[in-house]
A protein has these predicted regions:
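Membrane-anchoring alpha-helices and their flanking helix-loop junctions
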Residues: 1-72, 87-188
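Glycine-rich acyl-CoA binding loop
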Residues: 75, 80-85
């Protein structure tokens, strides 16, 4: 599982791009239009996902000099907030495309890709940080956020500049994809 996790960690973005392109091709081939209802459902999911990603990246990336695991901000409630954000973005894109049959496929592919990635990352971080990280992962959930924050939060803070420095590519990709889906609808 660790070898698969390392491979999926290195290739996860490429695989998600391929999946999104597949959605576009299938939508276009089957003459799917991107309805207003689809947009009304997908837009909040995409915004939620991107907001979670910005928050988590802003906390994680702005404090690289700390020699302790990040357990503040969204990491106090969930071990993998960036991946949860990515999940909501991907789900929003699938719904935007109007391919409801793709939802179970997306769920399966997402977890097949990210579960080994997370196992690999957690193994790497446990070796790097030792007992503090092992205690953290035994307390904080992996996928579903906890209402009660982790009691031993780190001093990591959120810096918006760092968040947008890392996330501008994802934001542009989402905007570009939304524009492309809109154009495909109008061209039909």
């Amino acid at each position: 599982m660790l070898r698969l996790g390392k491979w999926s960690y290195k290739n996860r973005n490429r695989l998600l791009v391929i999946f999104v392109l597949l959605i576009l091709v299938v939508c276009y081939h089957y003459n799917r239009t991107f309805s207003l209802l689809n947009w009304q459902i997908s837009f909040p999911l995409i915004v939620l996902g991107q907001t979670i990603r910005i928050w988590s990246v802003g906390v994680r990336e702005s404090n690289r000099h700390f020699k302790i695991p990040v357990t503040a901000g969204p990491y106090a409630h969930l071990r993998n907030p960036s991946y949860l954000g990515t999940f909501f973005i991907g789900l929003g894109i699938v719904i935007m495309g109007g391919l409801l049959l793709f939802i179970p496929i997306y769920l399966a592919l997402f977890f097949l890709l990210y579960q080994p990635t997370i196992v690999w990352e957690e193994d790497k971080l446990a070796r790097k940080y030792g007992e503090p990280y092992v205690t953290y992962i035994s307390t904080v959930p992996r996928w579903i956020p906890s209402i009660r924050p982790y009691p031993h939060r780190s001093a990591h803070t959120f810096l918006i500049r760092e968040a947008f420095k890392r996330e501008w590519g994802m934001i542009l990709a989402i905007l570009g994809l939304s524009l492309l889906m809109t154009m495909l609808t109008w061209l039909r």
